[in-house]
Amino acid sequence: MAKRVQVVLNEDILSLGRNGDLVDVAPGYARNFLLPFGKAVPVTPAVMKQVEHRRAKEAERQATLKQDAVAFRTALDTIGRFTVKKQTGGDDVLFGTVTNGDVAEAIESATKKEVDRRDITVPDIHRTGSYKVQVKLHSEVTAEINLEVVSY
């Protein structure tokens, strides 16, 4: 088997790894593609020290983000119920459906904090009533909120 060389990636490469990862690659791949285009740097003690420093800062940043997410989940639990107003027809059937964007707007209006609509999991809602909605606040923190759909 051919000798492999270690490099530290300067950017995310789909088939290889993320920025700051230490990866083993073929010497030709490193020499002909990664190094000349600035996508990676060869491993040296100074580079390893920078990588460790970057990882420590990233771990600290992630811990702070997680604490903020837990605090926001507590705020969502304190509020308890969020209301979305939709137009209805007969028998409390909605014209359309409740979307992630509708829920994000309801959360934003109540908390004054923006939530990405892609992080909200809404069940199929076609009638007025109460529903449970999942909100992903962090990779390790999710909140379940009560959503009240009412007619206007």
UniProtKB/Swiss-Prot annotation:
The keyword rRNA-binding applies. One of its GO terms (biological process) is translation. GO terms for molecular function: rRNA binding; structural constituent of ribosome. The keyword Phosphoprotein does not apply. InterPro entries: Ribosomal_bL9 (IPR000244), Ribosomal_bL9/RNase_H1_N (IPR009027), Ribosomal_bL9_bac/chp (IPR020594), Ribosomal_bL9_C (IPR020069), Ribosomal_bL9_C_sf (IPR036791), Ribosomal_bL9_N (IPR020070), Ribosomal_bL9_N_sf (IPR036935). Disulfide bonds: none annotated. Keywords: Ribonucleoprotein, Ribosomal protein, RNA-binding, rRNA-binding. GO terms for cellular component: ribonucleoprotein complex; ribosome. HAMAP family: Ribosomal_bL9. Binds to the 23S rRNA. Belongs to the bacterial ribosomal protein bL9 family. PANTHER family: 50S RIBOSOMAL PROTEIN L9. This is Large ribosomal subunit protein bL9. The lineage of its organism: Bacteria, Bacillati, Cyanobacteriota, Cyanophyceae, Synechococcales.
